[in-house]
């Protein structure tokens, strides 16, 4: 079941994906599609790929969108940047301005852990545009920004809920915990039809 749910989640993501850029890997940042513009930013390829803006700096990627639809910008951060800020704008409108807090993102992390933030970009903001400029900079003018790691994605908005919904032809189904369900039926019931559906 777990593999099936993971495959379903991956399929939803792939169907929704509009664009991807690999920060820190110049060949993909500077291609015709993404046309990176930057001032005082640093790309790295030593431990995965990443890019961050030095104090007062920035970097911008042109990214494809789904016009007239809600989109989502997916950015990966690391625990090593705990307490650093990052401000992200789409065509000049700030969509994310946060100080990274891994204690909020995960209960237990190490400095090599990564997590992905899904940032809504509304259909009103996108309008009929097929491309937007996505700008990354520090939220604090006198400090370096947090780094964006590995890949930055622009997707159509999609559901990430892969929970199971179970129904029974007889009795009731209750979720016991994250991995099990209980089916309660009358003592005279000899068989039930069980239907499983992904949310």
Regions found by a protein language model. Give the residues of each.
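Beta-rich interaction/scaffold domains
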Residues: 158-199
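Extracytoplasmic
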Residues: 1-158
